[in-house]
Amino acid sequence: MTEISTGKPASNFSAPSPDGKTISLKESLGKVTIIDFWASWCGPCRSENPNVVAMYNELHDKGLNIIGVSLDKDAAKWKEAIAKDKLTWAHVSNLKFWDEPIAKQYNVQSIPATFILDAKGNIVAKDLRGDALKAKVKELLGVK
């Protein structure tokens, strides 16, 4: 297993999107990319979503990409949460709950969990939320 830590390259992965297409991390990279581990049943994840949506709407055109990795097991609930919370970025899930291979690959023990990547795909920070997350993303994008 590759070590997943700050300063290291993020490990590539691919998984099905809600519409059944396979999406990979490599094709989702922007100037800054957030890998966001969450689930429809995770209260703290859903509470954080409005902050992430606002940040994405403000900074996507400046180079921010997000790929959501869900630990859901029910496809309908996953898709419903994406629509209800207006999560317009790329999403993937193998619908395997805590057996989600990408969560295991990234050694995710609890959610929400975030990994912030630079333009080269290196992990520069982990598990930031709210203002701290936005500040780090803006710093990486060179946005005031």
Where do the protein language model's features map onto the residues?
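Conserved redox-active cysteine motifs that mediate thiol-disulfide chemistry
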Residues: G30, F37-A54
